[in-house]
Amino acid sequence: MAQNNRLTNDTNGFVSKAQRKENMAAKNTPSAQAKLGIGTVIFRIFLSLITLILCVTVTVLTAAYVLLNGPCKPLRDRLVLSAMQASATKWLPGLFLADDTVEQIVANSYVVNTDVISLDEYAAESKNDAQGKEDEWKNAIDGMILENISGATFNGYILLIKDPSRVFVGTSSDFTQGLAGMRIFDIVKKEDAVAAINGGEFADPGGSGTGNNPMGITFARGACVWNDTLKRTFIGFDKDNKLVVTEPMDKKTAESLSIRDGVSFQTGNVLITSDDGNVTMHYADNNTGTAQRTAVGQRADGTVIFLVTDGRSASSLGATKNDVIDVRVKYGAVTAGMLDGGSSSLMYYEDYYTKYGIDESTLDEYQKKGLVNRYKAFTTPRRIPTYFCVAREDTEDSAAKGGDEA
């Protein structure tokens, strides 16, 4: 009877010793071990990655919270304004600070401390080793001079263009159909330009904008190509090839000033102005944060000064608004304005590394295509609606001529 009970129990769930040995032998076969090993490894790798991501996220968010809510307000303001410079990170400060606090920090950054100096005194103080010498343009290539610059927190690039009539606004489309903007490599082909920098502002929610339309009034070759009536800083050239930087600008005023080419950027980006024999530097009275920057200026002799700085890297954190003004002063600009920055900051110069004897092996993939600055975004250079382009020296269809014909 006991034996019968044992047999019954075995069939109801108990495994005999012989059966256990068979099962163990099956599990120890090479194929079974391989399947178990691969599954275990994949699971552990996945678990480790999730854990690492969570740890890094918590650490970063905690550090950001402490920094933004700590006792050091200058550091807080710098971090907030640096994040606000790029559309892709504008939402970050709102995670840790009240909206009115963020708005107040941004508003404070627009407070201007003007420095007024006579034009003669300014010209004497701003001359550097190159400017003002008779042979400055002796070794110029394409009627331009490319130079590297650096500051305490940034590396940058200066492109001097001797003839201001060659500088014009290139547009990605006629802005009537909402087409995506163009990358800088495409705009120079479309406009047959030898050089270019990014231009004005455009809608960029969350850093995902397509660059389809500009923001603020925009002129190209003597014609108003966009006018949404938004009040912005205006940066452009009149038909006498003089740089005009002012805010705000409307179509009626632009036409009365004979504007031929120009774009708009956020309010508060007038850098240097000159009138009545004086030059005024519009320094920021408070912290403006560091970022990639693009700006355009002009000397009294008409020379146009393009500036682009690198940013968001260990070797170049970025430049402040005041840094950009100081560079402009060094190069003798009597008028200057800031253009769109962050991941939009771009400078192109056709075959510059060949013309200036730069080792091509030191360049990244975009620089080998003609990009002068180092692009730090995670994608290809952005699609943008407007650019300041430089016509080729030998072209007869100059920007000034195009403006006169319009």
Language-model segments: residues:
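Short, solvent-exposed aromatic-acidic interface loops
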Residues: 173-177, 250-253, 309-313
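A short, polar/proline- and glycine-enriched secondary-structure boundary/capping micro-motif
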Residues: 178-182, 254-260, 315-322
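Zymogen propeptides
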Residues: 3-4, 8, 12-227
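Structural recognition of the beta-strand scaffold that forms the well-ordered cores
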Residues: 194-198, 234-236, 244, 295-297, ...
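Active-site-adjacent helix-turn-beta-strand microarchitecture at beta-sheet edges
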Residues: 202-285
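Short acidic-glycine loop/turn motifs at beta-strand connectors
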Residues: 161-165, 236-242, 274-276, 298-303, ...
